[in-house]
Amino acid sequence: MKIVFSNPFDSTELNEKVDGVVLKIGPFDYTFVRANVDRIEIDFDERNVKINDSLDSTAMLREAIRAFFIIVANELSLNKEFPNGKPAHLDDIAYAHLSWLFMNWFDDSTFEWEYNTSYPDRINVGNVRYIVHNMKEVSYQSTQGIQYGLSDHVLGRIYIIESDRGVVVPDSIKNQTFWHEYVHCLFVQANEDYANDIEYVVNAYATQIALFMKQFETFIDK
């Protein structure tokens, strides 16, 4: 049994196309619909997203994911100046880059997923292939008590800690740790280095990505 991710804009009927879908982002339901717009338009008050109706399903998914990053930043007020005086602003190019990097989740060929595990053991982030290592025991513990892992962007490694001072780390925390480190990889490969200095920005995206992707999960025998 293997986890795969389906594109909600793919029609199950030949010669038909999906006109709209509802996706949960954070606690809110956002409606994504085809419309006569140049690219995408987001209405944060009505919580709907209009996507260019000439796009195919893959391009619609790419635009929906780009909208996801914009919406998360808006709903959580991530684009602002932080207490350390360092501004955080993801411009349109960065959003597009992040969404492109994130699209690999809908392409089976870009990651390897072991049987019955909650995260892959190899994954592409842009042109970099990251290998995930499960560490049996280390003395490291996050100051926030949540993230039990680290990533090496030179060697292309993500390390997930399986036990801490003799205590087994629960699968739910290991899964959240993977997403946390994956978001670090996203930002680094998109050259948005500020997120490496502001952990709660990474935490926010990691949590929202984990919840967002649950909507696309399906299981196949493979």
Task: Specify the residue positions occupied by each region the protein language model found.
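Active-site recognition of the HExxH zinc-binding catalytic motif
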Residues: 61-74, 176-188
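Short pre-active-site segment immediately N-terminal to the catalytic Zn-binding motif
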Residues: 47-64, 155-177, 192
